[in-house]
A protein has these predicted regions:
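Short S/T/G/P-rich N-terminal loop/turn motif that feeds into the first structured element of a domain
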Residues: 1-37, 44-50, 57-67, 83-101
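Short secondary-structure boundary/capping segments
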Residues: 42, 79-80
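Intrinsically disordered, low-complexity N-terminal regions enriched in serine/proline/glycine
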Residues: 37-39, 73
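Outer-membrane beta-barrel domain signature
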Residues: 71-77
Length: 101
């Protein structure tokens, strides 16, 4: 399992346009083979910061996503809407289980 987490700082004046770009990339990505989760959420303490959570079955699935036309289009659309550099981290993990059983 590959996890991707991070944040995207948004320019306040570009927040709505950024959210439109996110909705579009989510629509395509959630149906990709090997994608288990593709979520963005506004930070509870800063509503101009998006939190990223992705889950992928394999390196291959993540690499195919990153090479896709819709992800390239997202990068193009989101770039000028950011207030700073994105902070995105990839995590490699083998197992998961419910925290509260």
């Amino acid at each position: 399992m590959i996890l991707v987490t991070g944040t995207l700082p948004l320019q306040p004046s570009q927040k709505d346009a950024a959210l439109d770009a996110v909705r579009e990339v989510q629509r395509h990505t959630r149906s990709e083979p090997g994608n288990h989760a593709y979520e963005f959420a506004l930070d509870i303490d800063d509503d101009h910061r998006l939190r990223i959570h992705e889950e992928w079955a394999s390196d291959e699935a993540l690499n195919e996503h990153m090479a896709s036309a819709h992800f390239a289009a997202f990068l193009e659309r989101i770039g000028d809407k950011l207030a700073g550099a994105p902070e995105v981290v990839r995590w490699d993990g083998a197992t998961s289980r419910p925290l509260f059983e």
